[in-house]
């Protein structure tokens, strides 16, 4: 068996609506489907889904880091902060040729916002 690509990223969240305010409303992911405590969001330009699963924290499980390609790191970072994200590393040009910010969402998951440096 070989891996052909990334299908979905599953993230546990304490509050589904609060998570949707960030991922759907601030970052622009689109809702594909949802049932009960789960909702799947489409990541534009890929076949990847971000699956938000509302449930209590599970002790001992590691967090997930998710990296999103955006058109404007600074604007996306500002929108994410307005929706409840916390800045870990402010937007900055990186030596590998990307502009990147690192944030945590309201549940403490790490997310990176990147775009090719100008």
Residues covered by each model-derived region:
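N-terminal beta-strand motif that seeds the catalytic metal site of vicinal oxygen chelate
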Residues: 1-18, 47, 64-68, 114-118
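Vicinal oxygen chelate
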Residues: 1-2, 77, 83-118
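Conserved catalytic-core motifs of GNAT/GCN5-like acyltransferases
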Residues: 10, 30-36, 92-94, 118
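Amphipathic alpha-helical segments
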Residues: 15-30
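Short amphipathic alpha-helices within nucleic acid-binding modules
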Residues: 22, 74-79
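Conserved short beta-strand elements that form part of the metal-binding/catalytic scaffold
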Residues: 30-62, 110-115
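Short hydrophobic/aromatic beta-strand element in the GNAT-like acyltransferase core
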Residues: 40, 49, 67, 88, ...
